[in-house]
Amino acid sequence: MKKDIHPDYHMITVKMTDGTEYQTRSTWGSEGDVMTLEIDPTAHPAWTGGQGRMLDSGGQVAKFNKRFGGLTLKR
């Protein structure tokens, strides 16, 4: 096996949308960083059976609706 070709794995903390946290090893960030999730399996409709709504924290849905809201399909 070649040396110094593998990424550096270190411990990070992942913070879920409900506030729970857990530690895992990752190549993301650096040792001790906190990854805050905006969407996770406890809040995403695909895993919750469609209950609840997804938060649009980046305004992407509003931006899409502003740009394409008046668009209609011609038949």
Swiss-Prot record:
Name this polypeptide is given: Large ribosomal subunit protein bL31
This protein's encoding gene: rpmE
GO cellular component, one term: ribonucleoprotein complex
PANTHER family in UniProt: 50S RIBOSOMAL PROTEIN L31, CHLOROPLASTIC, LARGE RIBOSOMAL SUBUNIT PROTEIN BL31A
InterPro entries: Ribosomal_bL28/bL31-like_sf (IPR034704), Ribosomal_bL31 (IPR002150), Ribosomal_bL31_A (IPR027491), Ribosomal_bL31_sf (IPR042105)
Assigned protein family: Belongs to the bacterial ribosomal protein bL31 family. Type A subfamily.
PROSITE patterns: RIBOSOMAL_L31 (PS01143)
GO annotation, biological process: translation
Annotated SUPFAM superfamilies: L28p-like (SSF143800)
Summary of the function given for this chain in its UniProt record: Binds the 23S rRNA.
Keyword terms, alphabetized: Ribonucleoprotein, Ribosomal protein, RNA-binding, rRNA-binding
